């Protein structure tokens, strides 16, 4: 379970929705009331839903799943990149390119081009080009890095997608829905919960609120990864012992063979192994 409390949510402004005139009726069950023509989100509903979402992310990460972090609006960009890198997950924090998931084969070609350009920069190829060519390659590299840098090591479709602001990232959500990829998302009062598997009702504009959501998600993933590695460690030790015992048995068998007659060797080695 997440360690985030209701007080922390209040302090981060998670409960502040949008102006009442922009509300989406499908968010009605999560609205507590209104103040100064601003909808107030019911944190008594948000907190358990938030915990469910974090638990799901943790279980998925513990089983080796990949979670794609998506937040391209200005207030979310830096936090998305920092926290996704911290828990070693892919991310998109600039403009979502149409087909980034549904046409991933083509995107892979662009990623390959990005890696080629990075290699050219590192091995000094750029320095051997004319100024004009070097500038063109540098600009191409920067453009690809900005749009694809966060997913260049993803190697395949993600197992889930964590989204800040489903309205702003509606194309990403649609692509995930089309491919059957679960969506965990922060949904404000002006957006619909359709297409979202794990809804987190909350403010999707305030930087402090965004930092709270994303850092908690990264914590859940990182903690699950550590626990998974710790649980897997004893299994590795057992396997090593079995190999060592097998080697000793083979050595014992070889010794018996050397002493015994050829016809009796197999029987005596079996008895030695049984002992």
UniProtKB/Swiss-Prot annotation:
Gene Ontology MF terms in the entry: structural constituent of ribosome
Organism superkingdom: Bacteria
Pfam families: Ribosomal_S2 (PF00318)
Bias type Low complexity, positions: 262-275
PROSITE patterns documented for this protein: RIBOSOMAL_S2_1, RIBOSOMAL_S2_2
GO cellular component, one term: cytosolic small ribosomal subunit
A Gene Ontology BP annotation from the UniProt entry: translation
Basic residues bias locations: 252-261
Keyword Nucleus annotated: no
Keywords per UniProt: Ribonucleoprotein, Ribosomal protein
Region listing for Disordered, in residue ranges: 244-275
Segments forming a coiled coil: none
Family of the protein in this entry: Belongs to the universal ribosomal protein uS2 family.
Name of the protein in its database record: Small ribosomal subunit protein uS2
Keyword Ribonucleoprotein recorded: yes
């Amino acid at each position: 379970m997440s360690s985030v409390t209701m007080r922390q949510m209040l302090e981060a402004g998670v409960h502040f929705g949008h102006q009442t005139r922009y509300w989406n009726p499908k968010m009605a069950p999560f609205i507590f009331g209104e103040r100064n023509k601003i909808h107030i989100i019911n944190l008594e509903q948000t907190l358990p839903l938030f915990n469910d979402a974090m638990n799901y992310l943790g279980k998925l990460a513990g089983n080796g799943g990949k979670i794609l972090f998506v937040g391209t609006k200005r207030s979310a960009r830096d936090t998305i990149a920092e926290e996704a890198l911290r828990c070693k997950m892919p991310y998109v924090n600039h403009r979502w390119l149409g087909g980034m998931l549904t046409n991933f084969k083509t995107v892979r070609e662009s990623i390959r081009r990005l890696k080629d350009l990075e290699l050219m920069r590192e091995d000094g190829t750029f320095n051997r080009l004319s100024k004009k060519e070097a500038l063109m390659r540098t600009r191409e590299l920067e453009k690809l890095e900005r749009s694809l840098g966060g997913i260049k090591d993803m190697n395949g479709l993600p197992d889930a997608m964590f989204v800040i602001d489903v309205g702003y990232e509606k194309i990403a959500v649609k692509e995930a829905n089309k491919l059957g990829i679960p969506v965990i998302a922060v949904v404000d009062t002006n957006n619909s919960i359709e297409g979202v598997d794990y809804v987190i009702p909350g403010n999707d504009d305030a930087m402090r609120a965004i930092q709270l959501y994303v850092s908690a998600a990264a914590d859940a993933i990182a903690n699950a990864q550590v626990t998974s590695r710790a649980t897997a460690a004893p299994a590795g030790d057992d396997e090593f012992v079995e190999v060592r015992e097998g080697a000793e048995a083979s050595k014992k068998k070889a010794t018996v063979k050397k002493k015994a007659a050829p016809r009796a060797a197999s029987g005596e080695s079996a008895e030695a192994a049984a002992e």
